[in-house]
């Protein structure tokens, strides 16, 4: 395989846009390595890590489960009611996650695509670690319908979440490539195949 298969691609998109489908296609059809920041966030909170110690020091023993682990649901309820507490948590977790992302990128298999998915790709500067960022855009009404069907969200809840994320227009500006996910899965897959081919044929 070609050396330039080691490209790093960031995938951005709002809730209900179909990012998970994009990641699945890249994994199945292009043997890509998927790095999800949310999973890394869990890892840096495990007992015995620096993240665990810092979070326990910042938020106290009350956020620990009976097993001595961080109760992520309890911690989430606590910080999302208080913007200052949320900023405090992010100040601990984000640098640790970014450090782990950098480590995994530096150690990646040079014969495989490396895909980075994080909700705060641009806000944390992780887009600068990528060769390209691909935005997944979907009409808002389609996203709302998907969220109702798959997660049981009300329209109000879906719209509230969407308002706090990058709009389709913003993604079209921020991203080097845009994948439109308004149609059938095969249409999305075809776009991904073309995007991968173009990226690998145009090394930087």
Model-derived features: where do they sit?
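Short beta-strand-centered segment that lines the nucleotide-binding/catalytic pocket of NTP-utilizing
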Residues: 32-45
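ATP-dependent small-molecule kinase phosphotransfer cores
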Residues: 42-113
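Small-molecule kinase domains that catalyze NTP-dependent phosphoryl transfer to phosphate-bearing small molecules
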Residues: 97, 101, 128-129, 149, ...
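Walker A/P-loop
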Residues: 20
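ATP-binding Walker
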Residues: 17
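ATP-dependent NMP and nucleoside kinases share a basic, alpha-helical "lid"
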Residues: 99-108, 113-150
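Hydrophobic anchor at the beta1->P-loop junction of P-loop NTPases
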Residues: 11
């Amino acid at each position: 395989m070609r050396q330039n298969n080691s490209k790093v691609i960031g995938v951005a998109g709002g809730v209900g846009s179909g990012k998970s489908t994009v990641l699945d296609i890249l994994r199945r059809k292009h043997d890509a390595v998927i790095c999800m920041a949310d999973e890394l966030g869990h890892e840096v909170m495990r007992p015995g890590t620096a993240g665990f110690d810092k979070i326990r020091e910042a938020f106290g023993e009350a956020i620990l489960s009976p097993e001595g682990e961080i109760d992520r649901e309890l911690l989430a309820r606590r910080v999302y009611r208080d913007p200052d507490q949320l900023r405090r948590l992010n100040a601990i977790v984000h640098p640790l996650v970014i450090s782990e992302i950098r480590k995994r990128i530096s150690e990646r298999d040079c014969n495989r695509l490396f895909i980075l998915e994080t909700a705060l790709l641009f806000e944390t500067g992780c887009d600068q670690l990528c060769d390209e960022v691909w935005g997944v855009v979907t009409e808002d009404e389609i996203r709302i319908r998907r969220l109702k069907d798959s997660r049981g969200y009300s329209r109000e809840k879906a719209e509230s979440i969407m308002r706090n994320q990058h709009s389709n227009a913003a993604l079209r500006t921020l991203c080097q490539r845009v994948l439109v996910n308004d149609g059938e899965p095969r249409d999305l897959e075809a776009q991904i195949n073309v995007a991968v081919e173009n990226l690998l044929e145009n090394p930087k």
